Every structure is written in structure tokens, then in C-alpha cells.
Amino acid sequence: MVAFRFVYIPLPFFFFFFFFFVFFSGVSQLQDQTATKKSVRILSKILIGDDGRVYACSDNDFFSFESNGSIAWSVHMNFKCNTDFAPVYSGFNQMLLLAENRILRVIFPRNGTKSEPELFFDPGETILGFAVSVSSSSVYITVKNHGLYAYNMFRQQLWIAEPKIERFGYRLGCRKDFDNCTFNSRPVIDSCEGSIYISNNEGELYSLSLRGTYYQWIQDFSLVDRFFTVTPGNNGLVYVVFPIKSLVFALDSFSGDILWQKTIGPLAETSASDPVIDSNSWASIGSLDGTLYSFSRTGDLYKIPKNAETDSVIQIEPLLDCSGYAVYVSQTKFEGMIDRVIEDYTYVSAKKPETAVFSLVVPETRSIYWSQSYSDQIPGLLLDEDLQHFVLDERIALAFVAASSSGNPFRCRSKHEKLSSSCSFAEPEHLDIYIGNERAIIWFLLFEFVIMVLFAALVRFCFIFWKKKKLQDRPFSTFLDKRRLLHRKSREIDKTITRLQNESTANESAVDKIGDLIQKRENVKRKLSSTYSLGRDIDESKSKLKDYVLPLYGGSSRSFSYRNRENESITIFQTPSDESSSEESYRDEHYDDVADDEHDEDDLDRKQKGKLLAHSEGSSNDGDGIASSRRSIYLKHIFDD
């Protein structure tokens, strides 16, 4: 495999003067070069906030710049800041930064009142880097030769993690040199997965949980190279870049499996090899061949532009715009570029830079929305004169271009909105489980639903059924025997009524018998639908009032009406009297009492038959007038068979 290494060979003292004259058009030339070096300060790496301001530190001061380069406010510190690390936003209008192996907390001014930076963490050892999780309000710090420390915002230690792990007698990390193995990189946080990624000096990459020292997976890259950079995609992927080998790996953030790998152009051996991931889940990285390489989640590669000029390089990492959909890229054209292959490395050399080109690119569509070239002067930047006190290289200039949204047609979004957009791409593709025939599963679920509904109905029926009065302290078999007896009686009464109706004679005795049988059948049906039903008990007093209707009496005459079996209607009107009413009421009550006796059904039939016979004889011996005075039957019944 052919690797690349960029070696920049400028003319003596030319590099400094080029950037000084290119980015300071309004500053006159100084006579003494030594005095010029003493008058300027070097800014640390840049952080662009959601408010559009640029945050950086220099020497013992922390600065907040407006997008035009003017200083919004500054805070003096007691320690000199480390320019290799950018400030980190920690929430609640606070910043954390590294200064002389100490982490300081800078609080934004309130109502014009500034507060001095406070010491957040001082291990007394070398700090390799730190990261902040705003969602969990925690800070994760890598201390050289010690491990990974987790602190909350109240400076309370949560836990400590080390690369040496032994579980059940097995080593999970540091397999080659267990004694001298240490973490040697700064931690990076995957906000979507809630994970921390950190590597050791043996080329192993760890994935830890934010909540504790739970190691999710360990991937060994020692066979590829021990020097690599890690960038969380916040989209279900982790990007591992090997600058010397010019390789890009995409790992599953859940399992650590390698999904794909690509070879790109030569990269600078600095942090400029870190890719930037936009909200469309495209990872972009600049190369020394002047090309912007963009990868989709599935590994599709776009080169922007397709045919890059051979005298251009991209030596600083692109910056994400405020919308999250585009990136700002800086290309530098050099005079006399030469590349040579020596053994496994490609060396690129150049004489002097000529032009810097800033562009706004959307990797997903390969569209260039804005581009501006600067040579000797940069009138288009319109930067404030406050920046004349600092060294303004193309890294700083690109940061202010991105902060001012130069040529950007997209709406700016907050960091939370951009993170939510990218996290939506983190689909659980690793859960590849065979679930069988979906159609069969749907039918099975439907069948289960029907069974559950039927079971619920059965439970409800049983709950209502066992609350019946006839089942309280009585055997269930007695209840069933009574139901069968009542059904048999109902059928016998129907047969008797049919036989009497089919007889040609319609005398008074037959009418009385039919009336009694109809009333008896109604009582049987009432019991089957209430006390001996399979449902809840019904209040019989209400049903009686609802079923019986008082007849209309217009004299002493009687009225009899018969119809055929298919559509039967019987209407009986007789003259009421006090004596007959009391006698009939007593007979009805006696009938109900005997009918409720569940232990002597034969006696019930015998009493009813004897009473019916005695009543029929009394009606035959008496005259029509006597019978009408002693009998009181108020019945109107209509039924259809």
C-alpha cells in the first residue's frame, strides 16, 4: 500500500509574510521583521457558537469575536492556554478550555459584569484532551499514564476507566503489552449513541458508555496503523482515518464492526485529517491533492471538484456551515508543486502559495453555492481591525468566513436541531433478526386478538353468571336440572295449547284452560329469562308491571278470539269482581311459591293439575253469571310461533 506524506518547503521567512500581507490589506508594512513577530499573537483552535460568534484563546486571554472579527468581550486568565485545543461549550453560557494542563471554566459576562475563570480540574499530570456531554452534564478527561476520568459539572468524580480490562480471567484490551498499555488520545463523544471513543498506544479503539465504565466493544487496528483519528458521525457510524495510509474506515457504532473502507488522496499528518459530518450524513475530508472527498453512510464516494487542479491542496479541515447541510472548504494554490514517491510515501513540496479559494459546498448534491478567490488582498472579507493583533492564517480566515455565513442561502439551525437531524440516520440496521413470514405473523396476531376478546367475554360471563341468587350455596347441577325441567314444561304447555286450539268446540271450559296454560307458560318463560337464565338476574317486579296490562271492561259480556297456529292471538275479557280477584291473586301467589320449590318438581305438577281440575268443575256447575262473578282473569296475549 502506498502512503503519502506532505512536506511543505517554503522560501525563507516567506510563509509568515504571505499570510500577513494576504489577510491584512489595511495594515501597512512594518520596517522591522523582528518587531512584527513580537506584535502579533497566535489564536488557538476556533469554536463557532450557535450565536454566530467565534471563540478562541491566546496566551493568557480568552476572546469572543463577532463574525466580522471585532472583539465582543475578553477575559484574562492566570494560566496560558493551549492553542492545540479549541474551547468546548459546556452549557449554561459556560466554556471549558485547556491551559497549562489545567481545565478552566469561563463564564460568559452577565449585564456587562465579567467573572474570573475558575479552576475546574487540575490533575498535576499531562492532560491529553477532554470532551463534554451537555446532555449528561459530564466532562470526560484523558490524563496521560492514568486513564479516563469522568466528572460532573459540580467537579465531583463519577468514575475512572483504564485500558487494561480483565473479565473472568480474559483480557479484553492491551493484549500485546499489558503492563505498558495506556490511553493516548482525547475522548470523543457520540451524542446519539451515548458512547465515548478513545484509543490506546497499541492501536486499539474502545467504545465506553457515558454512564459508567461499561466497555461496549474494542476494535484492534494495530495491523493497519497505530496512529489514527476518530470522529463520531452521530448517525450510527464511527469514522476512523489513518492519515499516513490515506485510509478511511466506517464502523458500526453499536457493534464496532467494519462496514466499509475507502482509499483517498494524501492527507496531512495533523488534525486536519478529521472529517466533518453534515446533517445529510455525508462525511467530508480534504486532501493534499486539492480534492474534497465525501462519503455517504453506505460508502458512496463523491470527489469535489471532479477534476481538481494539480497545483492545489486542502491542508485544513472543512468547517460545517450554520445550517448543517453545507461545508466551507479552503483550497490553496502553490507555485511549483512537486510530488515524489520515496519507498511507501509520497512527498509533496512547493515553493510558495499564490491564491486561497474559499468555497461553500453541499456534498450530497456536489453543488458549489459560493466561491471566492483571494490573492494579495481580501476586500471581500471586511474583517475588523481587531484581528490585526493576531496571526491570521487561512484556518482563522475560514472560521470567520463560516461564522459570517458568506454566500450561504440556507437557514441557520441550532446545534440541537442539527444533531437531531443527523441522529435520525442512526437506524438499527445491526438488529438483523429473521422474523419469518410476515403474512402468517399478521394472521397469527389477528387470531390471538380474537382469542383474547373471546376469553375476555368468557371471563365477564362467568363473573356475572356466578353472582346469580339461584347459584348461591346450591349445587350447579340443581340449577341445570331446573332449567331442563322448565324447558320441558314450556314444550308440553305449547303442545297442550295447540291441541285445545285445534278442537272445534270453543266452550267456556276450553277458554279457561287455555288462559291458565298461557299464564303458566309466561311464568315459565319469565323464570327462564331471569332467575334461571345464563345472564344476570332481572327484577321480576319490574317485568311484571311491564308485561301485564289492565283490560277494558264495558259490561258483563265476554269476548273470545282464536286464530290459527302460525299467527296465534288470544284475547279474553271477563267481568271482574272483588271475590274472584282475591281468589285468583291467592292462586297466582301459591303457583309462584310452588314453582320456586327446586326439590319437589313432581309435587308442583300434581298441585297445579288438581287446582286446574277443581277450578274447571266449579265453572261447570255454576251459571254464567256466577262464573263471571267468581272468576277474574285479565289477560291479553299475542304470540307468534
Swiss-Prot record:
Residues 584-593 have a biased composition (Basic and acidic residues). SUPFAM superfamilies: Quinoprotein alcohol dehydrogenase-like (SSF50998). Residues 570-627 are annotated as: Disordered. Gene3D superfamilies: YVTN repeat-like/Quinoprotein amine dehydrogenase. Residues 1-29 form the signal peptide. Disulfide bonds: none annotated. Residues 594-603 have a biased composition (Acidic residues). It is found in: Cell membrane. The chain crosses the membrane at residues 441-461. Required for micropylar pollen tube guidance. Plays a role during early embryo patterning. This is Protein GAMETE EXPRESSED 3. The gene is GEX3.
